Amino acid sequence: MILQALTAYYEQLLKQGKVEAPGWDSRFKVSYELRLGPDGQLLALNDLRQEVPKGKKTVIAPRELPVPHRVKRASGVAANFLCDNTSYLLGADEKGKPERSRQCFEACAALHHKVLDGVDSPAAKAILAFLDSWEPDTAPTHPLLAEQWADLNNNANLVFGCESPDGAHWLATTDDAIRTAWQSAFDTSDADAETARCLITGKEAGIARIHPAIKGVMGAQAAGAALVSFNAPAFCSYGHEQGANAPVSEYAAFAYTTALNLLLADRNCCQRIGDTTIVCWAENAAPAYSNAMLMFFCGGAEARGVSESDLAAALKALSQGRPVSFLDDKLDPNQNFYVLGISPNAARLSVRFFLHSSFGQFAKNLQDHADRLEITRPAFDKRENLSVWALAQETVNQKSRDKSPSPQLVGDLLRAILTGGPYPATLLNGVTLRIRAEREVTRGRAAILKAYYLRNYPTELNKEVFTVSLNESSNVPYVLGRLFSVLETIQSVANPGINATIKDRYFNSACATPATAFPTLVKLAQKHLQKMTTPNEVHFSKQLTELMAQLPETGFPARLSLPEQGAFEIGYYHQTQKRYAKKNEEE
């Protein structure tokens, strides 16, 4: 299903003229042009790099160009057509293995002769003449190359270019005769390949022995990783070797890898969260869908020129099945949409999740998630929404050296949000541990508690307790949380400027075993009330009386279960935020 969806995406892009036909890589980073004269002499080394924005600064980066399809290299010698590194195009490098460099150059010359012999094109003749006359030993000291030799050997890719006697010049990759010759060679390259019925297209075709590499996954090998590979006998069946174990045609292998590489290279379609790289796309290949989806669950709308209010309005409309105009495009809630999560695993890629639904259904799941997370927030917290990464960070000790949340948690949380399924128990466990360790109920932690219990245990009692702001529920754990917050306030008012409050010493015991903590705290509060002025004493005594009246006659509970502790923490958070809100209004 994954490969079929990616292949269909490639074919849609091909119809729209956004990708090259099979046999060509649409985007490849090229740094320099080797410009040749009609007789094959090297006329110039042209720098193709360009300035691109990176964060708040500008950097020099290679230019992305369409080039002939790249071979997948292992440890052997394998040349690429028209575009390669100095080892192949010039026969020299700084790796200290001159014999291997010469072998690379010879392989390059052999490939170009195989493709271009007999081609009636000045550019083709110039390239062959260059390869026949070039002396690799002269490359490092060549007057046109010496100054840039260090840069040329810094993982730079070069491409052949040509110049006519009248001064006109062009890249060899754009020469019609050369493109035709290469296309013919590529189309017949699998003539000797094993044939079988392709699992993706359903057609009898030559099977790809090794699939092209996937690049751009954070944490994977720089040379690329494989989504489909068989590199040990234990992975093979019925005597098949490598790609024959999962027959995918050369065309389909090219199509799905091209599509995935394009998605990974586009920041509007790709986002990394933890060790998971997420790519998403619409069936019609309109980029606005991917752009909007990443804003919905990863944030960053302001950086893309979209206000939080406009984003929220678009999400709400789509969740209700209404089309909206967004980023100069119309988003249809019925459009098929795909989300793929992948993680690095040595030379392979692991699929964390693959989701397919209508764009409107994804929007509804995200809207429901946002509604469950909604909770009153401190005045200093300006965030309209909490991203997936922000939620995962609430489970991590921010003072530790490694502040990365569990990759498994991030993946499970993403799946739950996008499918509308139950939140992972590890999310609740992580938040509970942080609250116990730090005795702090932040906005993010309170929002997680609220969302978790409303989604995983949608009882009437939970709907009554886990609300956006303070409510008058008589639920005992919730009332106890409110009571603890009031007791803390009484202590702070009676002893202004104290460094530690009852929260630092009693929060965990009050939350888990109220009967052991609250009698002491209530007695302590009476002493604090005596220190106050009469208006404050009356005000807080009234609050204490109202809350104590809602507790059972049997007294404080001996212990609270985990869900009840969640209600306690929400009650504490609600009451505390009401206190701060009132203080801000007075100021």
Explain the meaning of each model-derived region.
Residues 209-245:
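Short microdomains enriched in Cys/His and/or Lys/Arg
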Residues 1-190, 235-587:
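Conserved phosphate-interacting/catalytic interface
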Residues 207-211, 268-269:
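Short, solvent-exposed secondary-structure capping/transition elements
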